[in-house]
């Protein structure tokens, strides 16, 4: 294959992968040579080469074989001359020293947009989120750094992003002189990749290490992405060394994020780790009552019958976003048809949402989730083996089956290899004891319960 053929092949790939993927991952690749059935391509960085190898290699190989059927394998490598040409370039910049890090203008930080609705005033506090709210308020005061990082975690729709935005809003109001950078972990990765591709890593490092407060949402996104984790790790350390505040959110506790490097997990756990628990009935009702007052600004004549909000708070229990979305839809529908929001209208308008909220969790689903979580075969967990590595997950699955399904103890026992109901009862009791004594068991139960409810 020739370089001209590679250019034609790239155009075909453009149609397949789309403009953004092509620009980021395919366009920087240059054809090198073919030898012994291996086509070698030159890439600007190891990170880009690894990403392309994992995500586009099969597609590229298919296209390459259309041009050269003898090619059986692809190789992506950084040419040896890249480092040789980039390293000497640094001394030439010594005549134009950069401004000190603390002088970096906020405009260059390009923070992600903040939702104006997500403030502390609009955050409804209840027992499930009171600790997270208190910690967020403390950080938002902008005073001395007392815990670093603040790590907020919880399931979808429990208020992590709301609190993150609220902190950023409050800091900008109280301390306008501070450089506050808020972004998602995905945006961090894309900026990192862009800097690698454009050979502007020093600019990237300077921007991220000049902030006063770094806020990263959904940190689990960088799990499994080695180069991004490494840069995040060094950025984290640099900011902590400068006594700058770091605030992170994730969908689970740092120790439970799969494919996250241990050194990164360790850093994330070294501050205050706070769990946003699933909402209870009282908190959901409070959220609905607050949202109704906001909706009345849009619909001044809004009329809601007694019992409707209580009904919704009972029926939609796992996700606050779904709850708020249901209320928004209901108010809009009632306004359009000119009707009072009563139980009949609510059930007609939200029939699909209410059906989805009735999804039944099965024993079999629980067994699969638990076996995956503990990395054991399902057949071993429900089989006769009594090794601790199988017995404890089995008891966890029995406990969750008892708590999250309507199955009786004998029915649960039959689904665990025909075990007697007393065995199930013993397993449930044992886990109830362990979740008080063993923090890891309690965390496993919470993580599994969330995964099953999502």
Curated annotation (Swiss-Prot):
Belongs to the DnaA family. Pfam families: Bac_DnaA, Bac_DnaA_C, DnaA_N. Transmembrane segments: none annotated. Oligomerizes as a right-handed, spiral filament on DNA at oriC. InterPro entries: AAA+_ATPase, Chromosome_initiator_DnaA, Chromosome_initiator_DnaA-like, Chromosome_initiator_DnaA_CS, DnaA_C, DnaA_dom, DnaA_N_dom, DnaA_N_sf. Residues 113-334 are annotated as: Domain III, AAA+ region. ATP binds at residues 157, 159-161. Residues 82-108 are annotated as: Disordered. It is found in: Cytoplasm. Domain I is involved in oligomerization and binding regulators, domain II is flexibile and of varying length in different bacteria, domain III forms the AAA+ region, while domain IV binds dsDNA. Keywords: ATP-binding, Cytoplasm, DNA replication, DNA-binding, Lipid-binding, Nucleotide-binding. Residues 1-71 are annotated as: Domain I, interacts with DnaA modulators. The keyword DNA repair does not apply. Residues 84-99 have a biased composition (Low complexity). This is Chromosomal replication initiator protein DnaA. Its main location: cytoplasm. Plays an essential role in the initiation and regulation of chromosomal replication. ATP-DnaA binds to the origin of replication (oriC) to initiate formation of the DNA replication initiation complex once per cell cycle. Binds the DnaA box (a 9 base pair repeat at the origin) and separates the double-stranded (ds)DNA. Forms a right-handed helical filament on oriC DNA; dsDNA binds to the exterior of the filament while single-stranded (ss)DNA is stabiized in the filament's interior. Residues 71-112 are annotated as: Domain II. Gene3D superfamilies: 1.10.1750.10, 1.10.8.60, 3.30.300.180, P-loop containing nucleotide triphosphate hydrolases. Residues 335-454 are annotated as: Domain IV, binds dsDNA. GO terms for molecular function: ATP binding; ATP hydrolysis activity; DNA replication origin binding; lipid binding. GO terms for biological process: DNA replication initiation; regulation of DNA replication. One of its GO terms (cellular component) is plasma membrane. PANTHER family: CHROMOSOMAL REPLICATION INITIATOR PROTEIN DNAA (PTHR30050:SF2).
